[in-house]
Amino acid sequence: DAHTTEVEPKTSAPIIDVQPAQREILEKHMYGGTMRLGAYAAILKEKTQVLKLYQETGRLKEDEKRINELMKDKSQAFRLGILERGKKTVLERHRHRYEVNPRFVDLLEKNGMVFSGYYERFDKTKLMEYIELPNHPFLISTQSHPEFKSRLGNPSPLFYGFIKACGR
């Protein structure tokens, strides 16, 4: 019965849903400001496929420079959220209203999924950015749009990983 409220608004298991703070705004048909749009930071978990791909492609170092630039601009603090010192962090672009429902994160992890990256809002809500199935050759999903930063000579770490897995 798991579903997204974007497709099935009355699902009893809304795995993907709008955040509670957005619901009231959307019910009034006021869509401005309800979308996560542009670059946002994601803290990556150690010993995950996602972290390994970002390390292999050099994107961690590349994104570290941009994160340091954003830290100097107080008006962009919302893009970084709460960062944890010493944690590996990347920036990816977004364009969506729906998020993994925090109520289901523990259940999904208990059943084998790994949330390998997250963004932490200033209210301490963690928004899941990456999910993977560790023992699968390549089952990785993201909230971001890696195609926005992918180039032929510098592919997205996730696209790089997918092609690499296809070649095995």
Model-derived features: positions:
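Amide-donor transfer/coupling interface in amidating biosynthetic enzymes
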Residues: 1-168
